[in-house]
Amino acid sequence: MTSSSPKTRKSSTKSKAKRGSKSKKAAEIKAVQRLSKTPPPFRNKVVDKKVLKNLVAWAFKHHGTAATAAMADNLKDLGFRYATQAAVSISVDDLKVPEAKQDLLGQAEELITATEECYRLGEITEVERHTKVIDTWTETNERLVDAVKKNFNQNDPLNSVWMMANSGARGNMSQVRQLVGMRGLMANPQGEIIDLPIRTNFREGLTVTEYVISSYGARKGLVDTALRTADSGYLTRRLVDVAQDVIVREEDCGTTRSILISAEDGKFGNRLVGRLTSEQVVNADQEVLAERDTPIDPQLSKKFEQSNLQGVRVRSPLTCEATRSVCRKCYGWALAHNQLVDLGEAVGIVAAQSIGEPGTQLTMRTFHTGGVSTAETGVVRSTLSGKVEFGSKARVRGYRTPHGVEAQQAEVDFNLSIVPTSGSKPQKIDIPIGSLLFVDNGQNIDIDVTVAQIASGTVQKSVEKATKDVICDLAGQVRYETIIQPREVTDRQGNITLKAQRLGRLWVLAGDVYNLPPNALPVVSGNVSVKEGQVLAEASQASEFGGEVRLRDSIGDSREVQIVTTSMILNDFKLLEESTHSGEIWHLEAQDNTRYRLNTIPGSKIGNNEVIAELSDDRFKTETGGLIKYAPGLTIKKARSAKNGYEVSKGGTLLWIPQETHEINKDISLLMIKDRQWIEAGTEVVKDIFSQTAGIVTVTQKNDILREIIVRSGTFKLCKESKALDRFEGDGQIVNPGETIAKGIKTDSMVMVQSVETPEGKGLLLRSVEEFTIPDQAQLPELKHVKQPKGPSLGIKASQRLAYKDGELIKSVEGVELLKTQLMLETFDTTPQMTVDVEVIHDLNSKGDRLKLVILESILVRRDTTSDSSHGSTHTELQIENAQVVSAGDVVATTQILCKQEGVVQLPDAVDGDPVRRLIVERDEDTITIDSKGTTLLKVGQRVVDGDFVSKDQSIDACGEIENIDGKKVKLRLGRPYMVSPDSVLHVRDGDLVQRGDGLALLVFERQKTGDIVQGLPRIEELLEARRPRDSAILCKKSGTVDIKKGDDDDSVVVSIIEDNDVISEYPILLGRNVMVRNSQQVIAGEFLTDGPVNPHELLECFFTDLRDKKPLMDAAQEAIAKLQHRMVSEVQNVYKSQGVAIDDKHIEVIVRQMTSKVRIEDAGDTTFLPGELIELRQVEDTNQAISITGGAPSEFTPVLLGITKASLNTDSFISAASFQETTRVLTEAAIEGKSDWLRGLKENVIIGRLIPAGTGFSGFVEELNAEAGPHPDILAEDPAGYRRIQNLRPDYTVDMPSSPVAKNTAVLDDPSDEDLEATRSRHGIDPTTSNFAAFARPTGDDELSAEDQMPDPAALEGLQEEGLLSDE
């Protein structure tokens, strides 16, 4: 353009002032352009979130950070500028519901109505109905989503809701679906899908029911989020702990081991980027694509794909041989800047955070789909009309789909052709094994008919057994179809269940079913007509023992009849009532005026051996607490529990030594007397506490708190005689009257003598002993027993009980009662439901009250009920009157069950010995009569369903059984069929009567294990903690050929594996487990024999035992670990990928490396390890190599897998382990073992406040290592990370291993102890004081020895050679 337009001119004049700033900007832009090696390609497409992402990534890669930041800023300005001009917002009008919605819903409704109809006619089972309904709604929902997309695309592509969801700015398709489609199926709180979907969307609004259903899921979502945050945080902490000491410490470990990364569908994706090749990579033409240790960038990865490489071997942290760290070349690029990782980078922590951070994005859901099959299968339709022909190899078997459709399943792979009638080219379809065919061989079909459902791959999905109840919808009689062929199955516990063997129907034929009470008997016989109100059955209730009748008032729907079988009046005792402030107290007074306090209240019930009353007397009451002793002759009965005291079996004397005990819990400063001081009665011992008796005080205290003050009363005598003092030391002795205790001390009464030490001096305390005499029998008035010749009897016995056992010390200030005399009830021949009632009666002769004990038999009699849905009307008549005396077995009441509606009675088929529990009346409304218009095609007893033909042109519109055909009149008894699948458990037998709502059968069906799939976080946790799952799969231990046989039970099988050397190992498979292998199949170790979750520990064991037979120990261990590592990495990746989270493999590899780095020592051989010890594999390898050089026995070990928690607790650093969990245990063990912490990781250094050995602190760490190695740089030469187990190496003693062939048989020069050296010197007569020789001395770093000093003494060398500690060289 030569002339500038007016607009441009105008603007140019304006911009003269800004020219300086503009030229500056231009320079900036030029600089950016100069940086660019490749001109940016022109991208002419709609830029959504994904394209934007790629654009920024491209800019970052080609132009660095500054230019990318500038570009992002410009993009932001661009976006905001247009958003300012025309913003995108949502209004209600933007939510456009597609018109197709109503049609789609209508079609779904029709399908579901048809399904329900099939179920009503007994063509499909309850499970198939549920599955079909859910699948129908799921499909409708999908089709509705397509309709929504189509609607927006065609009619309103610039709709703001559509643009937001489509560009990835906000929201997704599932949310748009809920706004303008339908909300769809929801799950209930148990996680099962409710088969009633929410048909409306948020635009139309939800009904109350729909709102309630949909709020289940919403609440669950909120709770999940809260829990997820906590779980995810804890996971991150554990991961950091296990990997915190993985730091890049070496340039190159020089390993030759590697891992193979295979292409998926010819693509490597990002899986190779950032790795280094472990060997030369060549293509099919042997052209070198990359040398060893070449970093793979995206271009190289693409080049590999174009060369059609199936897999590339790369270096990986899993195979790195750097000890306790990772080398740069095995780790590869640091993903932050796509350059080789730096030395000192804490890759462990990066890995831990990369895995832990996305934890919050993972779901925690576990869904039960209720048998929804989600098989990825393709449906094939016919493209022309013609005749179906199966190939010659075809083998099919009958199969019923989860929707109840009869089909055929292919048993082999074959071809199917549809040969057209017109003679054009036939349609050929490949049918793989397991596919379903909906057409028969030779069948003629039209165009667009579903021919087959092709199975996707031979993925054997794991299934589980589930059950569903079939509930009866109407009352009536059960009839089986003969095809069911029920059989009885007895399980291990001996329970018998009835199972259906084939698919078939249970019929329930309508009728009015009556439940009979437990003892009722029918009074009508079968097939008899009955009128309304007629008696159908009668039940009678009789008295068991007989007696006097008492009628009670009715309670609820029954009334109680009591029969007094036995009674007893205590005539020798008057009953007195006394009112106290705490309530009424009743006493029994005997004729000799002794009183017994009643333990029960009149009107209450008591049982056998319960106490009725206790004697009130003070003969056995003491004044204070004290010590109790039984004199010889007093014996007590042995009893299980001493809760009620000890019953005296033979009387005697009870000895009582009083002692006053004050239980005090106060400060010692409140004590007002001295320990062991003599005090008088009434002395204040502690503030506000006074002694009641005179005696010697003993004070018990603990931690300056007064616990007890004991006052032992008696007479105190000073005594210097040591013999006497020793005799009464401790608990003391009882001395009889007249005995001499010590010189000048004699006693007139029985005393207890104890030697005590008081402030006045040593002496003897003579404590008085009180004697209580206990009679052999309790003195009681004569008591009668009421004995009956037959039936229950009762009586009263007296017993004496001691409250305390021999030698017991009663700590008390108040007195206690030592002996109680009790009146007890005795009953004979009673039944558990009988009780004894305590009653009061008025005695007319003495005008006083007496106590009466009564045994009652209680009978509950039903009251009349008008019509009740299951029992019918009942009428009850009492056959007795109040106060009537009845004999045992007399009828008390009869109950009649009356008919509700007239009809014909039928009794169920009698089962041996079982009484009739139900009967059925067939009413008029349970049958219908059909007038046949032609010759009837039906027979009596035939069962028909809706749609069957009566005559040629006339169909029935009801289900049932033909009862009678009378000329043209066909009588049909209405019924309802229920389909049951094979192996269903039948709850009813043929001919049983059922009420509405009873369970008929339990359908057993298989569903894919979608239910409770542990997804998301819990699954990650399960993998990283290496948990042993419940019901894990059975794994094959050795490779071989499969042979499947039937087990001992009908349902169990035994899988045998025949190995190459003809060894057979058998695996019994329990009931309910699915076998995943076929006969004659070749299996390898670790392959699944049954379905179920895998136990990683068992898998490792399988790999190792199999490889152990073929390879050396070390190689077998490494290979087994490698196989397990590969599996673990891919399992963890699967979980994250399924949730759309991308994590680089190397992060997971770093963690898995830590989990599999240890082995368990089984046999230590000649090494210093201990059996059962967990040691690093590398360390064991080094030690075994060293031992084998010297001809010693290497250690035997097995690889182990540790969960992240266990691995953290098993690190070499006890500071790190203790700061993680179980602090006390870790530190205690470390102290006992005398461990040293070498402060290698980050955590232990942080804890004690040192510089961490990563990043800038790494160089300091290397210097420190050099200093640590001291005069032995050779340690570092062969082990750059300085990680020799220094505990095993004495830092001041090194041994050069003999390398000559001669030296092979030489004993190893082990590190001799000081004692060994001393012994050798003395044996060879060497004086250590004069001979300070290198052969016997340890160089100590600072000893500067002259050359001659360092020459070994010939005598010393000779001695060592004789000892066999040196070779002859």
Swiss-Prot record:
InterPro entries: DNA-dir_RpoC2_beta_pp, DNA-dir_RpoC_beta_prime, RNA_pol_Rpb1_3, RNA_pol_Rpb1_3_sf, RNA_pol_Rpb1_4, RNA_pol_Rpb1_5, Rpb1_funnel_sf. Its cofactor is Zn(2+). The keyword Nucleotidyltransferase applies. Its EC number is 2.7.7.6. GO terms for cellular component: DNA-directed RNA polymerase complex. GO terms for biological process: DNA-templated transcription. The keyword Aminoacyl-tRNA synthetase does not apply. Zn(2+) binds at C253, C320, C327, C330. Residues 1342-1351 have a biased composition (Acidic residues). Residues 1357-1369 have a biased composition (Low complexity). Binds 1 Zn(2+) ion per subunit. Residues 1-43, 1294-1369 are annotated as: Disordered. It catalyses: RNA(n) + a ribonucleoside 5'-triphosphate = RNA(n+1) + diphosphate. This is DNA-directed RNA polymerase subunit beta'. It comes from Prochlorococcus marinus (strain NATL1A).
